[in-house]
Structure formats: C-alpha cells, structure tokens
Design a protein with these regions (language model features):
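Glycine-rich, small/hydroxylated-residue low-complexity segments
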Residues: 5-12, 16-417
Length: 417
C-alpha cells in the first residue's frame, strides 16, 4: 500500500521534470539561434532579420531574412519549424531565394522541381548544431544561355565560436551557344572560429575543383585539378590574408593531347591591415545597414562616409609577400621560380582619395606609394631576350620604385603596345 501511494508523487515529479526539460530545451534553442544570427551579422557581410517568431514548449517556428550588407541584389527567405525534445531539437524548413527586379531580368527563367528544404538538429546539452541542405537539380535560362546545376549539397555544423561548412557540387554546366564550360565535382570546406562580436576571428577555406573543361568549336581546354586555400585572421593588431593556388595540369587536347600546357602553384600573403580600422569599418557598415531601408541598396555617398576609415586600414603600411610562384610549362619549355614582396607607403594618407581612383591622376598617386622587388630564379634564356638583357642572364631582379618597374637595374621595356 505504501508503494502504491508513492506512485503518484513519482509520476508528478517525472512530469514536472519533463516539462522543465522541455521548457529548457526551447529556451536554449532560442538563445542559440539568436546568438548564431548575431554572430553572422557581426562579420559585417550580412544583414539578418527575423520576420516571424513563435516560441513554444513543444514546437517553435519562424522565418528569417538574409541579404548582403552592401546592396540588395538578392535575399534568402528561410523558414523553420522546430520540434523540441529533452536532449535535442529537430529542425526543418524551406530556403527560398529572391532576386531584385534588375537581377531577375538579368538571370532569366529558373526551372526547379521544388522549393529547397533543409534539416537540422540542435543538441541541448552541448549546444552543438548541425544543418543539412540538398538542392534538387535546377536550370537557369536566359537569351540562349543555360546554367545547369546538379548535386548541390551543404552541411553546416558547430557551436558558438567554432563553425564548419562543407559544400559539395557534382556538376555545373554553363552553355552559351556553341561554347560550354563544365566543372565538377567541387568540394568547399570552411572553418570559422571567433570570439564574441567577432572582435577576433579566423577563417580557413579550401576549394577543390576536380575537373574543368572549356569547349569551343575550334579547341578545348581541360584543367585537372584546381585547389584554392585561404586563411584570414583578424587579431588585436592586424588583418592578415594568406592564399595558395595550386593548378594540377592545364591541357589543350586539340593542340597537344599528350603534353600539358602548364601547371604549378602561387602562394601569397597580405598583412599589416590595421585591425582597429577594420573593426571600425565593419561597425560603420552595420550602422549604415541599420539606418537604411531594408528593401533598398545602401544610401548614396557611402564610400565618401567610409573613406576615412578605409584609409586608416592602410595606416600600418600593408605588405604583399609573394612567397612562391612556381609554374612549369612542358609544352612551351618554360619554367618560373620566383618570389618577392610589395610595400605600401602609408605616410600622409590624407593626400590620397579613394573616391578619386577613377581618375588617372589619382591612380598615379596611389601607384607612387608602392615599392618592392621580385626575383626570377634560373630564368630561361628567352626571358632575358624578351627583356632586352644579355642572353647569359640567369637571374632576373625586378624592382618597383615609386610604382615604376625596373629589371636588373634597367628600365622595364615595353612588352606590348
């Protein structure tokens, strides 16, 4: 009898615990979603807004609107429906791209069998989230041109401070009359780590394109494969961007079916971009977006208002280090092994104008701020011949002095009209 009397209190405790867990799951999901949207907006690249939100114990639903911070050529309307559980929340929804009238006219008709749907899961205890999206094949047609995309998939996972993205594309084909460009499979892997408000952040990206084929009636060009690596870091003092391009083989089968045209790699790093100025520019962009009309592009005169901040980004004398240019051309019998650096003179920045770069005189003033040097090691004889140097010259020293190029102490000859 005593045990029977305990059943009701135990069931009541279990029911209360379940209700509390459900409520906690709903609250934590909402907090995680809000934090993720704030983190996305803190990057300074996106405008994010919630057009609808209904939170409940068992389910929540809503819709989001994402668009580029600069301009409004397109936007993404994302809806979600969340089913809360004690340990996790399952989420699903739709993803609908919208184009502005000008871009819609330029793109033309889009043929897709259904609205893209996505699925995801939020783990209540760890705060880890994952999202999966698979696009049905679609075709865009305009004035005889056609873009055919097949096998597009995306996976996004992570938690506050650390997000990973993986995008897969089986094949993309662009047809314009008798010309055709085909590429794929394509894999993009990205990792983004940051602290609150993206004061410091780092992002690594790796794009791998297994095969590219360009077909013209007269000839074909094939590239296999291409890898692009990038690493961007914003720390206390500076923004650094490092990149590497690796090209496997470029072939022209109609001209030389057995011999590659070229292959190689290029590595470079841009550094000394003032960190505080970068953060201030991002804040100003977010302010401009907040003040403007969500349906319209950025207000006129934006570049003029940002000019001071943009010039401050250059205040630490940025430098571009080209650490490796290694290119080999079996078909032409040429090889390049070069490295060097360029430096920007940041003194008297108030004498420069970003707005005036469209004028030749202003562009000349900017070029005068650039100095640097490059060395082409073990250069072929034909390169010395092109540059008007003695045929026995094996090392080419390129100097940039106030924007003017010299080679081995001589003025750079005019290589083309």
């Amino acid at each position: 009898m005593r045990k029977e009397r305990l059943i009701a209190p135990i069931l009541a405790v279990i029911a209360v615990a379940w209700m509390v867990a459900q409520l906690l799951s709903s609250v934590l999901f909402e907090r995680s979603l809000r934090q993720a949207l704030e983190d996305l907006e803190a990057r300074g690249e996106w405008r994010v807004s919630r057009t609808e939100s209904r939170q409940g114990w068992l389910t929540s639903q809503g819709s989001l609107l994402l668009s580029p911070l600069l301009g409004r050529p397109w936007r993404l309307e994302l809806s979600y429906h969340a089913r809360h559980g004690v340990l996790s929340t399952d989420v699903e929804g739709t993803l609908l791209p919208r184009l502005d009238s000008a871009l819609q006219k330029a793109v033309g008709e889009v043929s897709a069998p259904s609205i893209p749907r996505w699925q995801g899961r939020y783990h209540t205890l760890s705060g880890h989230s994952e999202l999966r999206l698979a696009l049905a094949p679609f075709v865009i047609q305009q004035n005889g041109r056609e873009l055919d995309v097949r096998g597009a998939r995306m996976r996004l996972e992570g938690m506050f401070g650390d997000w990973r993205t993986r995008v897969l594309l089986d094949q993309l084909t662009l047809t314009d009359g008798l010309a055709q460009l085909t590429l794929g499979p394509v894999v993009l892997e990205s990792r983004y780590t940051y602290i609150e408000d993206a004061y410091h952040f780092a992002q690594r990206d790796h794009l791998h394109i297994e095969h590219i084929a360009l077909h013209y009636p007269a000839y074909d060009v094939q590239v296999t494969p291409i890898d692009i690596h990038s690493h961007m870091v914003l720390d206390e003092s500076e923004l650094r961007l490092k990149g590497k391009l690796i090209i496997g083989e470029v072939r022209v089968p109609s001209e030389a079916p057995e011999t590659p045209l070229l292959g190689g790699r290029i590595e470079a790093e841009l550094s000394r971009l003032n960190g505080d100025a970068v953060r201030q520019t991002i804040r100003r962009l977010r302010q401009e977006a907040a003040w403007g009309d969500r349906s319209l592009p950025m207000a006129e005169g934006l570049l003029a208002r940002l000019e001071t901040d943009l010039l401050k980004v250059l205040s630490d004398s940025p430098r571009l280090d080209v650490t490796a240019v290694v290119i080999d051309s079996p078909l032409l019998g040429l090889s390049v092994d070069a490295d060097g650096a360029l430096f920007f003179d940041a003194r008297r920045l108030d004498e420069l104008s970003v707005l005036g770069l469209e004028k030749p005189e202003e562009r000349a003033r900017w070029l005068e701020r650039i100095d640097g040097d490059f060395i082409w090691h073990d250069a072929p004889t034909v390169a010395a011949l092109w540059l008007g140097l003695p045929l026995g010259t094996r090392e080419l020293q390129f100097d940039v002095i106030r924007g003017v190029w010299r080679v081995n102490g001589r003025p750079m000859p005019v290589l083309w009209p």
